[in-house]
Amino acid sequence: MVRIAIAGAAGRMGRNLVKASHINPDASVTAGSERPESSLVGVDIGELCGEGKFDVFLTDDLEKEVDNFDVVIDFTVPVSTLANLELCKQHGKSIVIGTTGFSEEERALIDAVAKHVPVVMAPNYSVGVNLVFKLLEKAAKVMGDYCDVEIVEAHHRHKVDAPSGTAIGMGEAIAGAMGNKLSDVAVYAREGITGERTKDEIGFATIRAGDIVGEHTAMFADIGERVEITHKATDRMTFANGAVKAAVWLHSKPAGFYTMTDVLGLNEL
């Protein structure tokens, strides 16, 4: 049984992670944290999520519970995730990171910590999205050289970063399959007189509206035809279940940086 701590357990995603951990037969929620100023600190995590009494209470600092968990699952914000990453390094704990919006310097720090403890990091934890990443690699190898590639993503009005980590992950999969770095070919905004698109660029468009959980489409467009690969999520439990699956898988692994491709064994396809 893998003992899991949920960072930001009172948030929308945090509550789903608590539920997903509770229903997974190989996992148990044994700790959860919230911001120190939260009025929910001290509340029973199970009751908070409508799952009944767990006798596990929200803390304002996971270090207070460090002997009570094996793996942290963190879908919060970069500054909080990096603090929990350092905590895991100091105490030899594993961490599953679902937070997005890291700078290049912060990503480098995560890579450095992964030399000391097991880390899974992915822009999206749904099985379907990670299968899409593999499909995009294959499509890019066949069509990327002669098609225009555009990525469109849509999320709810409360999402604070754009484009989404999943959209960037799609772009990285396509660019990598074509021998490029995404940072060299990505175009994140178009406005006014932009001129014709270049051959290699990968364009991104972002929608923020209503309660959209997450929709992503990658388009390979040629003259006379186009191929679109789309994923639509309708329930955040999809992501939560995948993250808990990753936590259970990670617990038995040595220090290193892993992705959902590793968790799901997609490199074997």
From Swiss-Prot:
- Entry annotation: catalytic residues: 155 (proton donor/acceptor), 159 (proton donor)
List UniProt keywords, sorted A-Z.
Amino-acid biosynthesis, Cytoplasm, Diaminopimelate biosynthesis, Lysine biosynthesis, NAD, NADP, Oxidoreductase
Which pathway is it part of?
Amino-acid biosynthesis; L-lysine biosynthesis via DAP pathway; (S)-tetrahydrodipicolinate from L-aspartate: step 4/4
Q: Where does (S)-2,3,4,5-tetrahydrodipicolinate bind?
A: 156, 165-166
A single GO molecular function term of this UniProt record:
4-hydroxy-tetrahydrodipicolinate reductase
| Catalytic reactions of this protein | (S)-2,3,4,5-tetrahydrodipicolinate + NAD(+) + H2O = (2S,4S)-4-hydroxy-2,3,4,5-tetrahydrodipicolinate + NADH + H(+); (S)-2,3,4,5-tetrahydrodipicolinate + NADP(+) + H2O = (2S,4S)-4-hydroxy-2,3,4,5-tetrahydrodipicolinate + NADPH + H(+)
Q: Which GO BP annotation is one of this protein's?
A: diaminopimelate biosynthetic process
Q: What is its main location?
A: cytoplasm
Provide the residue positions that the database annotates as binding NAD(+): 8-13, 34, 98-100, 122-125
One cellular component term from this protein's GO annotations in UniProt: cytosol
InterPro entries assigned: DapB_C, DapB_N, DapB_N_CS, DHDPR_bac, NAD(P)-bd_dom_sf
EC class of the enzyme, as a word: oxidoreductase
Compartments in which it is found: Cytoplasm
Give me the residues that bind NADP(+), please. 35
Enzyme Commission number(s): 1.17.1.8
**Similarity field:** Belongs to the DapB family.
- Protein's job: Catalyzes the conversion of 4-hydroxy-tetrahydrodipicolinate (HTPA) to tetrahydrodipicolinate.
Q: Which NCBIfam families match?
A: dapB (TIGR00036)
> HAMAP family per the record?
DapB
**What protein is this chain from?**
4-hydroxy-tetrahydrodipicolinate reductase
This chain's source organism reads Vibrio parahaemolyticus serotype O3:K6 (strain RIMD 2210633)
